[in-house]
């Protein structure tokens, strides 16, 4: 199927599937097949923020006074988060936009990816405010085996979908000889790669950030690195929205009532999808061991983090219809919810930067019915 950025063929976008239908031509929002994506877009736009709004001058002093094992925890997490959001700042656009068929999903993907670039900029803002030579931190990201191994598990699903989609657009379905290698292209196989890629992205948003989040908030609970925690809190708020987006996409694909023609694919890929979740949980436990190899920090250690990983993995898998792989348990670090739920804490504006504000949340549309109860 040849791809075009503007299809001249008139179609009814309400009857198009989310993926692998006719490419989007007119970006219209007066009619929507799935209104949830418009709601996500509006919410993300209301969240807009810039890392430069947060003062990190105190964090530099705090960081210099941290023991070496806590400096290792702090910097290692920033490196890993930089890698994750470097991937997420570009990959959803490259992988999903060429195969999306409805405008509201197309715009949500673009809005989502843009917000990830703000996260990447945030890590640079944090790092250059606490160390004298940021290049030493960034240059180590690719060469650090503990980070590199996890990156491979994330990028492989994106890369495979992107490559196969390119072949499909250029050559169509069939068996093709490319550089001496036979490539089998068919729509059903593409749908499988799409579903597994979406699962991998869901896992990234659902699990992979939360070890780093927990460590950042644990520092702030001790009134250390508080500027960093404010930025991470804004990032966590965004990531929760992105997680909601991927969960909705996956649940819509698996619901037979939506006519997405993916039910069989979902069933066939279920075992591999579950393995992606479990594998990610094990990798995050390994990462926790790496972080705390030289000692724990006050309020958090490897064992507690591993319990938390199992706890959130159960919740995330249940949210998309999978069975919980680990023993059911309560949240081992309940205080983290105060940081992950942005409305829980009231702060006087003159005391600190507010990290829970929303932009453009006033509804300016007023109907005649609003005035019926008024009497002159």
Curated annotation (Swiss-Prot):
Domain of life (superkingdom): Bacteria
Description of how the protein assembles with itself and partners: Tetramer of two alpha and two beta subunits.
EC numbers for this chain: 1.17.4.1
Enzymatic reactions: a 2'-deoxyribonucleoside 5'-diphosphate + [thioredoxin]-disulfide + H2O = a ribonucleoside 5'-diphosphate + [thioredoxin]-dithiol
CDD domains: RNRR2
Pfam families: Ribonuc_red_sm
Binding-site residues, Fe cation 1: 85, 116, 119
Function in brief: Provides the precursors necessary for DNA synthesis. Catalyzes the biosynthesis of deoxyribonucleotides from the corresponding ribonucleotides.
A GO BP entry: deoxyribonucleotide biosynthetic process
Protein name in UniProt: Ribonucleoside-diphosphate reductase subunit beta
Native source organism of the sequence: Buchnera aphidicola subsp. Acyrthosiphon pisum (strain APS) (Acyrthosiphon pisum symbiotic bacterium)
GO molecular function: metal ion binding; ribonucleoside-diphosphate reductase activity, thioredoxin disulfide as acceptor
Gene this protein is translated from: nrdB
Active site feature: 123
């Amino acid at each position: 199927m040849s791809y075009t950025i503007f299809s001249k063929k008139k179609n009814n976008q309400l009857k198009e599937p989310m993926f692998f239908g006719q490419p989007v031509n007119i970006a219209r929002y007066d009619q929507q097949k799935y209104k949830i994506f418009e709601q996500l877009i509006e919410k993300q736009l209301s969240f807009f923020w810039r890392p430069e709004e947060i003062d990190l001058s105190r964090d530099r002093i705090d960081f210099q006074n941290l023991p070496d094992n806590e400096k290792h925890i702090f910097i290692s997490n920033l490196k890993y988060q930089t890698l994750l959001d470097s991937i997420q700042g570009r990959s959803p656009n490259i992988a999903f936009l060429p195969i999306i068929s409805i405008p509201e999903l197309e715009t949500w993907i673009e809005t989502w990816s843009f917000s990830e670039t703000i996260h990447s900029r945030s890590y640079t803002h944090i790092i250059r405010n606490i160390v004298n030579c940021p290049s030493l931190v960034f240059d180590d990201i690719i060469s650090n085996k503990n980070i590199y191994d996890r990156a491979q598990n994330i990028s492989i699903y994106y890369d495979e979908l992107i490559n196969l989609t390119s072949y499909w657009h250029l050559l169509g379905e069939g068996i093709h000889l490319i550089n001496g290698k036979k490539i089998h292209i068919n729509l059903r196989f593409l749908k499988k790669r799409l579903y597994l890629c979406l699962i991998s992205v869901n896992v990234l948003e659902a699990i992979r950030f939360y070890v780093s989040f927990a460590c950042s908030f644990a520092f702030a609970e001790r009134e250390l690195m508080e500027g960093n925690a404010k930025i991470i809190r804004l990032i966590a708020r965004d990531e929760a929205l992105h997680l909601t987006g991927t969960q909705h996409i996956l649940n819509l694909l698996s619901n037979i009532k939506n006519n997405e023609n993916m039910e069989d694919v979902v069933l066939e890929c279920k075992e591999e999808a579950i393995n992606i979740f479990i594998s990610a949980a094990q990798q995050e436990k390994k990462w926790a061991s790496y972080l705390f190899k030289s000692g724990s920090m006050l309020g958090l250690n490897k064992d507690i983090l591993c319990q938390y990983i199992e706890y959130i993995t159960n919740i995330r898998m249940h949210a998309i219809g999978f069975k919980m792989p680990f023993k059911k348990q309560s949240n081992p670090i309940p205080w983290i919810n105060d940081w992950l739920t942005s409305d829980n804490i009231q702060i006087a504006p003159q005391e600190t930067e507010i990290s829970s504000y929303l932009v453009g949340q006033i509804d300016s549309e007023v109907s005649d019915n609003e005035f019926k109860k008024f009497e002159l």
